[in-house]
Swiss-Prot record:
Localization terms from the record: Cytoplasm
Catalytic activity: NAD(+) + ATP = ADP + NADP(+) + H(+)
GO cellular component: cytoplasm
The name this protein goes by in its record: NAD kinase
GO molecular function terms listed in the Swiss-Prot or TrEMBL record: ATP binding; metal ion binding; NAD binding; NAD+ kinase activity
Binding positions for NAD(+) per the UniProt entry: D45, G46, N122, E123, R148, D150, T161, A162, Y163, N164, K165, S166
Cofactor(s) in the UniProt record: a divalent metal cation
Lineage of the species this protein comes from: Bacteria, Bacillati, Bacillota, Bacilli, Lactobacillales
Active site: D45 (proton acceptor)
E.C. number: 2.7.1.23
Length: 268
């Protein structure tokens, strides 16, 4: 089996990477960071996000496994003291995986015919730098509302527990092929009206926004940000691609949610 190892630069992560590399070589794995079958990430969710974007053109060929060297993350199933068990599981690999939906973002600009396409694992956001953002929102090709506020967040089911949740969005099980549109500090009064509620969007529907005004928009795609954009239109849709995780002992989603946000009541 060809295995790639992707680590952050924290000392503990680098120690685990070195130990894991030795064990892989002892058991005759091929270390191949360029064309892996399985990518093992060492760190946390941010490390896995970075690995996802590095291998984004190979998602149909690889599966991810996360080893966490800090707190339990949503994408990391193994602790740093369990690498021997991980190697044994990889040796008996049967190719099983669990797959989660991704978000495609299509951006067109006012000053050119260029169109950029991005893919997000968690979410994409749009906001203005210096003042209120005003934008028309279309769902499934039909006008829905004119939004005024700080910005908008479109998230995947796995991303629903990230920035989306801090905005008051719903937590969505990652086996559902849906998107979530959440407003960021919308303005609602006698003059201006928005739904002011998170929306779950069906997989067949595009979310389209046409922002109004100056060229000072910021677009974020996961942890990447793009500044001072002259945006004409952004379309969001469930991607045809998916991310695949090796299914050795993939942690139950609601257990992850309980651990991350509620914890052990007996510990209080």
């Amino acid at each position: 089996m060809r295995v790639g190892i992707f680590s952050n630069n924290v000392r503990r992560s680098l120690e685990v990477k070195a130990a894991l590399t030795r064990r892989f070589l002892e058991r005759h794995f091929i270390i191949d960071d360029e064309n892996p079958e399985v990518v093992v990430t060492i760190g946390g969710d941010g490390t896995l996000l970075s690995a996802f974007h590095k291998y984004i053109d190979m998602l149909d060929k690889i599966r991810f496994v996360g080893v966490h060297t800090g707190h339990l993350g949503f994408y990391t199933d193994w602790r740093d003291d369990e690498i021997d068990d991980l190697v044994i599981s990889l040796q008996s690999d049967n190719g099983q995986s669990v797959s989660y939906p991704l978000l495609d973002v299509f951006v067109t600009y006012k000053d050119s015919n260029k169109r950029d396409v991005f893919t997000a694992l968690n979410e994409a956001t749009i906001r203005r730098i210096s003042s209120t953002m005003v934008t028309d929102i279309f769902i499934g090709g039909e006008f829905f509302e004119r939004f005024r506020g700080d910005g908008l967040c479109v998230s995947t089911p796995t991303g629903s527990t990230a920035y989306n949740k801090s905005l008051g969005g719903a937590v969505v099980h990652p086996t559902l092929d849906v998107l979530q549109l959440t407003e960021v500090s919308s303005i609602n009064n006698r003059v201006f009206r928005t739904l002011s509620s998170p929306m779950i969007i069906a997989p067949k529907d595009w979310i389209t926004i046409e922002p109004e005004g100056a060229a000072d928009f910021i677009l974020t795609v996961d942890s990447d940000s793009y500044h001072k954009l002259k945006i004409k239109e952004i379309k969001f849709k469930i991607s045809k691609k998916k991310i695949h995780f090796a299914k050795y002992r993939h942690t139950h989603f609601w257990h992850r949610v309980q651990t991350a946000f509620i914890g052990d009541e007996d510990a209080d």
